[in-house]
From Swiss-Prot:
It comes from Aspergillus oryzae (strain ATCC 42149 / RIB 40) (Yellow koji mold). It comes from the Eukaryota. It catalyses: Hydrolysis of terminal, non-reducing beta-D-glucosyl residues with release of beta-D-glucose. The gene is bglM. The lineage of its organism: Eukaryota, Fungi, Dikarya, Ascomycota, Pezizomycotina. This is Probable beta-glucosidase M. The keyword Glycoprotein applies.
Length: 768
């Protein structure tokens, strides 16, 4: 067991002050040495708490391994299957090996599985219970297919850069929001007996220059995320703390550098923060091709390399022989990997690794059915709840028995063909022009069993109603029948791994919207968006009556949307990011950082804004957003009243018990309840609905407000429910870089409760 006392020197904060260069261009990484503190040795897993039995078995298993067998556990190998990566079997000890596969929104490159809603869509649902159910049902598909480890979910990137190409894979730009949803997701997936490799650790906030590049013989290193200790803890490490507390068996380290040390050999973040401070018991796996050093990476805390390693292999045993690596480090690497296998109970009753992942899906192979009829309800509900209604002029929606609807836009139709993975565009256009967008591009993509496109679902609805539907998918300036009751315009905003987005708008799509709106007095716009999408060019058009951010719903996209359009479901989604009125409002956090000036060969991205990203930055700078973080409309109305703030006895500003043994997630006293808050919410509208009650706290000397509670509740018409929030010590503390502790602050705290980060009808305070 690790104790908190004595960690101050080990976990000292990172300085962002650099010595002035003595030459125009920096040509050696030696210039940056020491900017990321060295933390050695790599802590051994303790097998504490829920891991005790798994570690006992793993240590006995590893004791019977040869050095070569231990080494083989630490790096991927080729196998005749379609898994993203494989660890070889050890037949003499009945270890069948491991299959690890993408990704956090459903399996890809295989058949008989579902394409689930993406991370951003789950974030927009604000539904913790649904997040766990989604994880459980999705995890069961991986289990049936013989996948030991799901490569996900994602909490890095957090979403610092508005144009970030992979923001859609994560849940939210807020660390608290993201942390609770990833916690429930991991609990769900691992309850299905499948491990998670949560990613990308850490501060992986842009795709541009994420990897080293070489052009015309000139080598450019990966971008460095330069981040101070306070910001690291209060933003980027926060959701990973919830990841560790949830018991994730693996964490995937990221491509880029952190304070000029590569993420997969950064001893500060791996040995210091993850394995010591947070008490992580699982193993650290590289992203694909993210290993940049040999023995240095193992000593820094890396445990497994994917998809293979040319730097380890026999070099590990050689390093032990020559004293550059301890034998105990290799034992710990192997133990962490095998303990995770035992922790998921995969030693008994688990399918053969990769049995449902054929190397060639188009060649004859055994059909392993991953999807289940039991998942249908959760699949659809997950798709429904991530839609966010942001405009509904004169209660345009839900539709009132229209006799005729007209459909326009490239995003309305399904793809012309459907294989075992949607097209991964080899560049990053503003839109996916060929079909409706249900998922982003890259390794986070998935393999739909079918795609319910909006046009298909609307046609089915029209058949059932006996009404009429017209459509023109391809025209940029279509004709509109004057007798149509509603014009439904479908556009999208694309994003993919490997590229950051070129912008937050698309002129062609905006022109389509305004062209239709100029001819139709009831224009309803649906945007399938893989990230922030600005709407300032047409949001105030008098004929644009309703707007839905539909995000990335997965294969039930059309079905989910029609449920909402026709009022069988009431919109309950809320934005997990801020939509600005102008791209310039995001300031320096709009674009990714590029190589420039003296850092042309070593790109530097200074996180100098600290904790002020997204709504925190808008609040600090007094910028009025188009739609604030947490905003979303309903077909009903909710009234808030009866704010009650009750402190519990232990609210000392002193350090929490320093002798407390570290458990998964850190000091267990961080979750001691310090404050209880309750409010009453009444449904004062015409229909039943779900409301997301949000609690924000203004901590002394901190941001104006930070999300510190949310609950989604169903409220019948005319009924009142009481919503309760329990706030822990971590929720009300700030990170002290000197004490290296989470500390409560002396002074007056503000408490806000309401419908969004800016619609907060209830306000109170308490003093510590």
């Amino acid at each position: 067991m690790h104790a908190i006392a004595g960690l101050t020197g080990l976990l000292a904060g990172v300085s962002l002050s650099y010595a002035a260069p003595t030459h125009e261009n920096i040509t050696s990484d030696a210039y940056f040495y020491g900017q990321s503190p060295a933390v050695y040795p790599s802590p051994e897993g303790t097998g504490s708490g829920a891991w005790a039995s798994a570690y006992e078995k793993a240590k006995a298993f590893v004791a019977n391994l040869t050095p070569e067998e231990k080494v083989n556990l630490t790096a991927g190998t080729d196998a005749d299957n379609g898994c993203s990566g494989n660890i070889p079997a050890i037949p003499r000890l009945n270890f069948p090996g491991l299959c690890v596969s993408d990704a956090g929104n459903g399996l890809r490159s295989t058949d008989h599985v579902n394409a689930w809603s993406s991370g951003i869509h789950t974030g927009a649902s604000w539904n913790k219970d649904l997040a766990q159910k989604r994880g459980l049902h999705m995890g069961s598909e991986y289990h049936k297919k013989g996948v030991n480890v799901l490569l996900g979910p994602v909490v890095g990137p957090l979403g610092r850069i508005a144009e970030g190409g992979r923001n859609w894979e994560g849940f939210s730009v807020d660390p608290y929001h993201s942390g609770l949803l990833v916690y429930e997701t991991i609990r769900g997936i691992q309850a299905a007996g499948v491990g998670t490799s949560t990613k990308h650790y850490i501060a992986n906030e842009q795709e541009t220059n994420r990897n080293p590049e070489s052009t015309d013989g000139i080598d450019v290193a990966a971008v460095s995320s330069n981040i101070d200790d306070k910001t690291m803890h209060e933003l980027y490490l926060w959701p990973f703390q919830d990841v560790v507390r949830a018991g994730s068996v693996s964490i995937m380290c990221s491509y880029q550098r952190i304070n000029n040390s590569y993420g997969c050999q950064n001893s500060k973040t791996l040995n210091g923060l993850l394995k010591t401070e947070l008490g992580f018991q699982g193993y650290v796996m590289t992203d694909w091709g993210a290993q940049h050093g040999g023995i240095a990476s193992s000593n820094a805390g890396l445990d497994m390399v994917m998809p293979s390693s040319t730097l380890w292999n026999s070099n590990l045993t050689d390093a032990i022989a020559n004293g550059t690596m301890e034998a105990s480090r290799l034992d710990d690497m192997a133990t962490r990997i095998i303990a995770s296998w035992y922790q998921m109970n995969q030693d008994a009753g688990f399918p053969s690794p990769g049995v449902g992942m054929p190397a060639d899906v188009y060649a004859p192979h055994q059909a392993i059915i991953g999807k289940s009829s039991d998942s249908r309800k959760v699949l659809l509900q997950s798709a429904i709840e991530g839609h966010v209604l942001v405009k509904n002029k004169n209660n345009t929606l839900p539709l009132k028995s229209p006799e005729m609807i007209s459909v326009f836009g490239y995003d309305a139709k399904g793809p012309d063909s459907l294989g075992f993975a949607l097209e991964w565009l080899s560049y990053s256009p503003a839109i996916q022009p060929n079909h409706t967008l249900i998922v982003g591009g890259g390794s986070g993509g998935n393999s739909p069993a079918y795609i319910s496109a909006p046009l298909d679902a609307l046609q089915q609805q029209v058949i059932e109603d006996g009404s009429s539907i017209l459509w023109n998918i391809s025209a940029q300036d279509p004709e509109v029948d004057p007798n149509t009751d509603a014009c439904l315009v479908f556009i999208n905003s694309y994003a993919t791994e490997g590229y950051d987005r070129a912008g937050l708008v698309d002129e062609g799509s905006d022109e389509l919207v305004t062209n239709v709106a100029s001819k139709c007095s009831n224009t309803i716009v649906t945007i399938h968006n893989a990230g922030i999408r600005l709407v300032n060019n047409w949001i105030d058009h008098e004929n644009v009556t309703a707007v839905i951010f539909a995000h990335l719903p997965g294969q039930d996209s059309g079905r989910a949307l029609v449920e909402l359009l026709y009022g069988r479901s009431n919109p309950s989604g809320k934005l997990p990011y801020t939509v600005a009125k102008s791209a310039d409002d995001y300031g320096a956090l709009l674009h990714p950082k590029l190589p420039e000036g003296q850092y042309g060969l070593f790109p530097q991205d200074d996180f100098s804004e600290g904790v002020y990203i997204d709504y925190r930055a808008f609040d600090k700078q007094g910028i009025e957003p188009q739609f604030e973080f947490g905003f979303g409309l309903s077909y009903t109305t909710f009234d808030y009243s009866g704010l009650n703030i009750g402190q519990v006895s232990d609210n000392s500003t002193s350090r929490y018990p320093p002798s407390a043994a570290i458990q998964e997630g850190g000091n267990p006293h961080l979750w001691d309840v310090i404050l209880r808050v309750s409010v009453d919410i009444t449904n004062s509208g015409p229909v039943a609905g779900d409301e997301v009650a949000q609690l924000y706290v203004g901590i002394p000397n901190g941001p104006v407000r930070q999300l510190r509670g949310f609950e989604k509740v169903n409220i019948p018409v005319g009924q009142t429910v009481t919503v309760e929030f329990a706030l822990g010590r971590r929720d009300l503390s700030t990170w002290d870089v000197v004490a290296q502790e989470w500390l409560l602050q002396s002074g007056t705290y503000q408490v806000y409760v309401g419908r969004s980060s800016r619609d907060l009808p209830l306000q109170g305070e308490f003093t510590i």
